[in-house]
Amino acid sequence: MTMNCEAVVQHLVTWLREKVEEAGARGVVIGVSGGVDSAVAAVLAQKAFPDNCMALVLPCESSTEDLIHSRLLLDRFNMPYRVVELDNVYQLLITKLESYIKLDGSKRRLLRANLKPRLRMTTLYYSAQARGYLVLGTTNKSEITVGY
């Protein structure tokens, strides 16, 4: 099967513009993780909204490699971005919550792991609302595959 990649890109860019306009927004905020899914979405967002696209890199006990990949992508495509370190917020919240919620083992690990994307989500929505933008969400194909 032959695919016209430029036509697919143009279709997605047009769709993004339509959805943002329908919502009465001016652009998009996107979280860039250093992975393939957010990289593709970020480049599409930049094409759709060259002057109204903000990328956020939101490390929270993340690998240095993820941060490097994110910055390389964003610099390569000349996208405006901010790095918002969430480590301290995460640790503070864990300390407060676990002072009265006693858990151990796998349940504790799961709750801690789930808190990280929720902190990122809150940060993305705060930033988007402040600008009159929408959050351009990204999926993670490997998470979908395993049912996360």
Model-predicted regions and their roles:
Residues 1-147:
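ATP-dependent adenylation/nucleotidyltransferase module used to activate substrates
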